[in-house]
Structure formats: C-alpha cells, structure tokens
Amino acid sequence: MPADTRPAAIVLMGPTASGKSQLAIDIAKRWGGEVISVDSVLVYRGLDIGTAKPNAAMRASVPHHLIDICEPWETYSAADFAHDARAAIDMIVRRGALPILTGGTGLYFRALLAGLSDMPPAHPEIRAMIAAEAKRDSWATLHTRLAEVDAITAARIHATDPQRIQRALEVYLVSGRSMSDWQNQPPKQRLPLRVLKLVLAPTHRKVLHFRIAQRFKAMLDNGLLAEVNALRTHPSIHAMARPLDLPAMRAVGYRQCWEHLDGMYTAEMLYQRSVAATRQLAKRQLTWLRGELDALWFDPEHDQSRIEKVMEAFLNR
C-alpha cells in the first residue's frame, strides 16, 4: 500500500472542563503545531472568563486561531467556521506546522470534517422580517409555522431556540425549499488531511462534575459577573429588544449571570443553575462524542504517556 502523503492534523475533542486547551498547547509545543479553536463561543470578543478562554500567556506560547474574531452582537455560523478553519489549516500546513483542532462544538467539527451541504446565504431583510414577526407573535408561533413547511427541521428545534427557528424559516423563504431538503444534498468535499481524532474525558463522571463545579466557582471569583455586566451595558447590546437571544448571550453561564443581575434569583441559585447547565452541556457533548467511532479516548489525569505514544506512532508512520 502506498504511503499516505496527505498532511497530518490532530483533532482534540472532549466535554467542557476536560483540559483540552492545555493539552492542545502541550501537543503544539512538543510537535511544532498551531491551535485552531473549534468553539462557538470563543469566537466572541469580551467573553473571556466564562468561556475559560486561553489567556494571553497561553496564546503567546503557541499560535492560536479563530479566537476573538467576532463581536458578541454578531452571528457566526458553522459554515463561517468551516470556511475560516480551512483557511487557517492551509496557512498552518504551508508553514510546515501541525494543525491542532480543539474544542467541544460538535456542529463545527462536523461542518469542517464531513462538510456542509450548500444553503442560501443570510438575507438581512428576510431575517429582520422574521424577527419582527416573532416580536409580534412569539417564537413559539413561528416554530408552529416552521412545522407546517418543514416538519423534519421543526422536530429537531426547540420552540425556545430563536436562532435556529429564524435560520430555518429564512432558508425556506429565500429558496422555497426546506432546510431538511437542503441538508439531504451531498456535502462538499472533505478535507484532504490525514486526521487523528483524540477524545479527552475523565473516566468517571464524578470527576468531570467536580471539575465543572470548581471551574465555575473560579470564574465567579475571577470576575465573571463584572464581565457579564459589561456586556449587558454595552451600547450595541443594551439597545437590542431581545439581547438574550444573541448566540453569545445564550452561552452557558452568561445567561444565568445576566438573569441574576436582573434580580431573577440569588447568588446561590446562580451557582447551582450554572453548574447544572454546564453538566447538561457536558452530557450532550459526551453523547455526540460516543458517535465518533474512529476516535481514541484518553483520561486527562492518567493517560499522558499513552497520548504521547499514539501521537508519535501517528506522526511517524
């Protein structure tokens, strides 16, 4: 069999709070790599503490890509990510470095590695019309309308998910075809890379739960509430009728802090709700990761030497 001459890339996945960011940096230092963030929240400027965003020292130690590229009142789609990540990968490979893609946003990984079917681009006027109808009639009503034209997509979207309802209706109104119909098209060509998929996840669920709780407490101690308050009072966000519908503000921890600052519940309830929401996020991520049948799983506390051996075998073959 001829040797596989495609450039190598590392895909490092895992649930939140599993230690992916530091491991990605360690791999980059050891093997001459650059890190590409695969995270739908790290793209936003100003969301630092609550996202456990790699700090300045970490980002100075090895090059990082696709962090702090959007304002929090902007939208950034999986298609946007796939386009930007491909450009970053091409640049890294041309430099002779190793692309290391790390994060926990499954949709972004799928968009990049498996490809997305072509869909109509965003249409600002149609979006504005849908938003106005939602303000008048409610997103639940628009969800019902979506079900009438695209029952398959509506069944996958919760009635309280305005971003996805809006996009599904936008696709239908712009093209006259349902989103599910578009998604049934063959995807674009996959990446021409030789990929090693690693999953970093504690073996025992209790360990992950402990890490989640400790990390959120540290976020609060490090000024998360002040960070959220700065976002709440930013003119571009404060002027919005429904700022909590922004993708950035729907991130785990940020919505709960916002609601606490609005007086909806106590500091203790804020902590409990945020930890519970983060656990649910981790559970969803683990469910998705179990479907990645070609991925190798590692425990962050016990498998460092095993990761080293797997990396060496992959890169030297």
Curated annotation (Swiss-Prot):
Residues 39-42, 163-167 are annotated as: Interaction with substrate tRNA. InterPro entries: Dimethylallyltransferase, IPT, P-loop_NTPase. Keywords: ATP-binding, Magnesium, Nucleotide-binding, Transferase, tRNA processing. ATP binds at G14, P15, T16, A17, S18, G19, K20, S21. The record marks T105, R127 as: Interaction with substrate tRNA. It holds the Pfam family IPPT. GO terms for biological process: tRNA modification. GO terms for molecular function: ATP binding; tRNA dimethylallyltransferase activity. Its cofactor is Mg(2+). It is an enzyme of class 2 (transferase). Disulfide bonds: none annotated. It catalyses: adenosine(37) in tRNA + dimethylallyl diphosphate = N(6)-dimethylallyladenosine(37) in tRNA + diphosphate. NCBIfam families: miaA (TIGR00174). Belongs to the IPP transferase family. Catalyzes the transfer of a dimethylallyl group onto the adenine at position 37 in tRNAs that read codons beginning with uridine, leading to the formation of N6-(dimethylallyl)adenosine (i(6)A). Monomer. This is tRNA dimethylallyltransferase. The gene is miaA.
